[in-house]
Curated annotation (Swiss-Prot):
Sequence similarity: Belongs to the krueppel C2H2-type zinc-finger protein family.
Subcellular location: Nucleus
Biological source species: Mus musculus (Mouse)
GO MF annotation terms: zinc ion binding
Protein name according to UniProt: Zinc finger protein 655
Record field: transmembrane: none
UniProt-annotated stretches for the region Disordered: 1-22
One GO biological process term: negative regulation of G1/S transition of mitotic cell cycle
Alphabetical keyword list: Metal-binding, Nucleus, Repeat, Zinc, Zinc-finger
SUBUNIT field: Interacts with VAV1 and CDK4. Interacts with INTS13; promoting association with the integrator complex.
One GO location term (cellular component): nucleolus
Function: Probable transcription factor.
Zinc finger (C2H2-type): 243-265, 271-293, 334-356, 361-383, 411-433, 439-461, 495-517
Domain of life per record: Eukaryota
Length: 541
């Protein structure tokens, strides 16, 4: 038999009890029968008593405590013979582990007496049989006494490196109210089966613990009242446990998930943005939308190398930053083995490698090499003079659609050799040589070769001056005259006529005016031989 040293005892988990209140009720007949049966089988108070190695019998101290939901008490021994009431109590063994550990003092009282202090205690079980007996006692207690109002069901995988048998420990959780006690079982890393009764909330918080194996539900975590509820739950088919949508028949394990799904059919959008009044069906969608208004960018690209076009780029959504980070993984991953140039796509690398190799695209006419077929096709059009784009107005065709049409003047005058882009311009020009004047003035009978000249002539008859100068209340028949008048004020006209002392804003106007005095006519018509003082007069003939 191995002895438990004081050092091992000090390192072992501790179990503390909070003060319990007394209760005046006695044991029920079922509990009395259970207690008597257990005592005959070598149990004390419904729990197996196993003395660990190295601990003498005289160090055992039995304590009785009540597990009722409201009032509790601790007494030593059984109920008094003179008492007519039966105390509803269970006996739990408490043992002193080591002298180095602070000695415990249990205030034993009769009825209506609390526990002031309960020392550290630990019950060690080495055999599976004793553990199964303890589990049987716990199950009987659950059926007889409805003390445990809630049972947390879960399953965990047992693992141990020292022993091949699974390792389990028990704990009584008193962090809840007395009417909501939870019995839990958890896995441990110890090399022995440990039974810990921990009722002090201040001592180590533990994860939700497994109940005994017979109470475990392998599929779900549910809060059940007793074993009958668990059996009823296990007997239900999986389809009955889920939540089903009546519209599309889709099933969900949670009612909240079904509620969110049904908003797709009802088009309900209960979450509304206060700024733009846009509605959303889920709160997460509203949170993402609010980042647009606040310009919050919670997701940042932490890449600082040159491969990132925008270092420390921030995104408002995680999907955007993930897409951005993919660019770093794939950015410039294709490298040319000849010149070590790097490309982001394999197609670009293939096109670049053609420049190092023999040009695959070669012109059959002149022998020029090209790395792209599009360049070769464009080059061959020059040799074959292919004119793919035809101009509808004049019937001319061009290699390119834009830019070339205005560089060519296919219409030429036979008399003077002048070229024109449009046929209408050539016809208008030929009227100068032929002297044809189709446009005649109705008032004076004067004829003109162009309609623009006739319109200008009509303004002279009507003295129309549609362009008015607001500052000096003057009007002009031509917009160009108005523009010149606005640019140069009257007092700034520096060109004066010596004969009439008239001022002009431009030197050309002064020279033209002086011809009135000198009667000079420098413009001569080549056909009729007449001379004119102004260019416009020669065109108006």
């Amino acid at each position: 038999m191995e002895e438990v040293t004081s050092q091992e005892a000090a390192e072992s988990p501790r179990g503390h009890f909070q003060p319990l209140e007394n209760q005046s009720e006695c044991l029920s007949p079922e509990l009395r029968f259970l207690q008597d049966t257990d005592m005959e089988q070598g149990f004390s108070g419904g729990f197996p008593i196993s003395k660990p190695d190295g601990i003498s019998e005289r160090e055992q101290d039995l304590q009785v405590f009540d597990l009722e939901s409201k009032n509790r008490e601790v007494i030593r021994g059984d109920c008094s013979d003179g008492e007519t009431r039966e105390e509803n109590k269970l006996l739990i063994p408490k043992r002193k582990i080591s002298e180095e550990v602070h000695s415990y003092k249990v205030r034993v009282g009769k009825f209506k007496q609390d526990i002031a202090q309960v020392p550290e205690t630990r019950e060690v079980y080495k055999s599976e049989d004793r553990l199964e007996r303890l589990q049987e006692i716990l199950r009987k207690f659950l059926f007889l006494e409805r003390e445990f109002r809630q049972i947390t069901i879960s399953k965990k995988t047992f693992s141990s490196e020292k022993n091949t048998e699974p390792e389990k420990s028990f704990s009584l959780d008193s962090t809840l109210d007395t009417d909501q006690r939870v019995l839990r079982i958890q896995t441990t890393d110890d090399s022995k089966y440990d039974m810990n009764f921990n009722q002090n909330p201040a001592v180590g918080e533990q994860e939700p613990i497994n109940l005994t194996e017979n109470f475990q539900s392998t599929d779900y975590k549910e809060s059940l009242m007793d074993l009958s509820h668990l059996n009823k739950w296990e007997s239900m088919p999986t389809t009955d446990r889920s939540y089903k949508c009546d519209t599309c028949g889709k099933t969900f394990h949670q009612a909240s998930a079904l509620t969110r799904h049904q908003r797709i059919h009802t088009r309900e959008k209960p979450y509304k943005c206060k700024e733009c009044e846009k509605s959303f069906s889920q709160s997460s969608s509203l949170s993402r939308h609010k980042r647009i208004h606040t310009r919050e960018k919670s997701y940042k690209c932490e890449a600082s190398d040159k491969s990132c076009d925008a270092p420390d780029k921030s995104c408002s959504q995680s999907s955007d930053v993930l897409q951005h980070k993919k660019g770093h993984a794939k950015a410039k991953s294709y490298k040319c083995g000849t010149c070590e140039r790097v490309f982001s796509r394999s197609v670009h690398l293939t096109q670049h490698q053609r420049t190092h190799k023999d040009m695959s695209c070669k012109c059959t006419v002149c022998g020029s090499d090209f790395c792209h077929t599009s360049y070769l096709v464009e080059h061959q059009r020059l040799h074959h003079q292919e004119k793919s784009y035809e101009y509808d107005e004049c019937g001319l065709a061009y290699v390119k659609q834009q830019g070339i049409r205005f560089q060519e003047k296919p219409y030429s005058c036979n008399e003077c050799g002048k070229d024109f882009r449009l046929n209408s311009h050539l016809i208008q020009h030929q009227r100068i040589h032929t002297g044809e004047k189709l446009h005649e003035c109705n008032e004076c009978g004067k004829s003109f070769s162009q309609t623009s000249c006739l319109i200008q002539h009509h303004k002279m008859h009507r003295k129309e001056k549609s362009y008015e100068y607001n500052n000096y209340e003057e009007s002009f028949s031509h917009s160009s005259d108005l523009t010149l008048q606005q640019e140069v004020p009257i007092r700034e006209r520096v060109f004066d006529c010596d004969a009439w002392e008239e001022n002009f804003s431009q030197r050309a106007h002064l020279i033209q005016h002086e011809r009135v005095h000198t009667k000079e006519k420098p413009y001569e018509c080549s056909e009729l031989g007449e001379t004119f003082s102004q260019v416009q007069a020669s065109f108006n003939m």
